[in-house]
């Protein structure tokens, strides 16, 4: 692509290049005399810019176009510099056709017919040499990868349920992204230069599901509608309605084996025995609880009777003590005359002693 479309000449000769370009897109030969453009070697950035500019022209027109460029005496200079013209690789190589020494035939004035879909169009550069100059027919095709990309996009969009306008918009945005990534890369890549802006991203299904960008060795993928995809992936499959279900579908075979009736009878008998034992256990437990309750009631009554009898005994003792005190007081009052008698007895005894002494 760089060999076919780059190196049109310096900036001061843009008017001449515009006239040739107008004659080329109109499909008719240019009748204005042209000046031989000076040939110069472009740097990597200028080559990338020329590739980006030229890659947009084939997309503008789906048909191939042919241009006629007449060169003057600088033919030898142009052919002697192989380093300034890079031969495209792959199917876009230069196919030289030996031209006549006379003017180009009238058939080259009009655009050539479109190539078929099965046969990919290629970049064709034909040199027709003449003593006065050289004529070069350049046929710039549409990108050969567009058909494959469109088929992949339609298939992936059909699976994802996206509409055709959204796929076209994604394709255009990805083309612009690919052009930006390709313009920032190295100019020595032959495949990028020969592809004419072909996508530098990864497979088409990823491009349809989101945005893919490359920064050096890293590839970034941003999915569209990530929350919706997560919700759809986690949603249970819808149950078909009853009207849609087939009526003649065979019933599923039971996975449980048939039950033996003897097992059921044994299970019933064992259940009854277990129930009887549980009933007897509950009855015994109830009787034991009743006995414990009666014993507890007897203990409580005995304690109450003991407390009552103890209280009565204490009351009787208290009453006896008070009665004894009262009797003691009565006895003291009754013994008061005895003290007088004791005094009289002492007086009589003294009198007797005096009489006994007089008698001696």
UniProtKB/Swiss-Prot annotation:
<dbReference type="GO" id="GO:0042802">
    <property type="term" value="F:identical protein binding"/>
</dbReference>
<keyword id="KW-0472">Membrane</keyword>
<dbReference type="GO" id="GO:0062196">
    <property type="term" value="P:regulation of lysosome size"/>
</dbReference>
<feature type="compositionally biased region" description="Gly residues">
    <location>
        <begin position="179"/>
        <end position="198"/>
    </location>
</feature>
<feature type="modified residue" description="Phosphoserine">
    <location>
        <position position="173"/>
    </location>
</feature>
<dbReference type="InterPro" id="IPR019314">
    <property type="entry name" value="BORCS6"/>
</dbReference>
<comment type="function">
    <text>As part of the BORC complex may play a role in lysosomes movement and localization at the cell periphery. Associated with the cytosolic face of lysosomes, the BORC complex may recruit ARL8B and couple lysosomes to microtubule plus-end-directed kinesin motor.</text>
</comment>
<dbReference type="InterPro" id="IPR046465">
    <property type="entry name" value="BORCS6_C"/>
</dbReference>
<protein>
    <recommendedName>
        <fullName>BLOC-1-related complex subunit 6</fullName>
    </recommendedName>
</protein>
<feature type="region of interest" description="Disordered">
    <location>
        <begin position="1"/>
        <end position="201"/>
    </location>
</feature>
<keyword id="KW-0597">Phosphoprotein</keyword>
<feature type="modified residue" description="Phosphoserine">
    <location>
        <position position="130"/>
    </location>
</feature>
<feature type="modified residue" description="Phosphoserine">
    <location>
        <position position="204"/>
    </location>
</feature>
<dbReference type="GO" id="GO:0051036">
    <property type="term" value="P:regulation of endosome size"/>
</dbReference>
<dbReference type="Pfam" id="PF10157">
    <property type="entry name" value="BORCS6"/>
</dbReference>
<keyword id="KW-0458">Lysosome</keyword>
<dbReference type="GO" id="GO:0072384">
    <property type="term" value="P:organelle transport along microtubule"/>
</dbReference>
<dbReference type="GO" id="GO:0098574">
    <property type="term" value="C:cytoplasmic side of lysosomal membrane"/>
</dbReference>
<feature type="compositionally biased region" description="Acidic residues">
    <location>
        <begin position="144"/>
        <end position="155"/>
    </location>
</feature>
<comment type="subunit">
    <text>Component of the BLOC-one-related complex (BORC) which is composed of BLOC1S1, BLOC1S2, BORCS5, BORCS6, BORCS7, BORCS8, KXD1 and SNAPIN.</text>
</comment>
<comment type="similarity">
    <text>Belongs to the BORCS6 family.</text>
</comment>
<feature type="compositionally biased region" description="Polar residues">
    <location>
        <begin position="23"/>
        <end position="33"/>
    </location>
</feature>
<dbReference type="GO" id="GO:0032418">
    <property type="term" value="P:lysosome localization"/>
</dbReference>
<dbReference type="GO" id="GO:0099078">
    <property type="term" value="C:BORC complex"/>
</dbReference>
<feature type="modified residue" description="Phosphothreonine">
    <location>
        <position position="201"/>
    </location>
</feature>
<feature type="modified residue" description="Phosphothreonine">
    <location>
        <position position="41"/>
    </location>
</feature>
């Amino acid at each position: 692509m760089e060999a076919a479309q780059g190196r049109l000449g310096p900036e001061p000769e843009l008017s001449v290049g515009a006239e040739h370009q107008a004659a080329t897109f109109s499909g008719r030969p240019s009748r204005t005399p042209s000046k031989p453009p000076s040939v110069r070697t472009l740097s990597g950035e200028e080559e990338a810019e020329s590739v980006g500019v030229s890659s947009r022209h084939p997309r503008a027109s789906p048909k191939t176009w042919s241009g006629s460029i007449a060169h003057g005496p600088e033919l030898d200079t142009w052919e002697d510099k192989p380093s300034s013209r890079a031969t495209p690789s792959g199917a876009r190589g230069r196919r030289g056709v030996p031209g006549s020494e006379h003017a180009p035939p009238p058939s080259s004035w009009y655009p050539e017919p479109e190539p078929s879909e099965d046969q990919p169009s290629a970049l064709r550069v034909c040199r027709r040499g003449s003593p006065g100059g050289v004529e070069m027919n350049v046929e710039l095709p549409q990108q050969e990868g567009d058909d494959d990309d469109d088929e992949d996009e339609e298939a992936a969009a059909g699976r994802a349920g996206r509409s055709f306008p959204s796929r076209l918009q994604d394709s255009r945005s990805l083309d612009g992204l690919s052009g930006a990534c390709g313009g920032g890369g190295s100019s020595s890549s032959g495949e990028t230069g020969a592809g004419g802006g072909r996508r530098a991203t990864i497979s088409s299904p990823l491009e349809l599901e989101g945005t893919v960008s490359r920064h050096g060795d890293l590839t970034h993928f941003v999915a569209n509608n990530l929350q919706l995809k997560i919700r759809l992936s986690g949603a249970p499959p819808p149950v078909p309605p009853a009207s849609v279900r087939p009526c003649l579908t065979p019933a599923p075979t039971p996975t449980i084996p048939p039950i033996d009736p003897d097992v059921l009878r044994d299970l019933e008998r064992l259940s009854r025995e277990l129930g009887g034992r549980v009933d007897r256990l509950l009855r015994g437990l109830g009787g034991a609880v009743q006995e414990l309750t009666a014993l507890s009631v007897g203990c409580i009554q005995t304690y109450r009777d003991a407390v009552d009898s103890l209280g009565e005994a204490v009351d009787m003792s208290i009453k006896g003590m008070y009665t004894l005190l009262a009797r003691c007081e009565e006895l003291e009052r009754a013994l008061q005359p005895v003290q007088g008698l004791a005094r009289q007895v002492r007086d009589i005894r003294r009198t007797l002693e005096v009489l006994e002494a007089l008698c001696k």
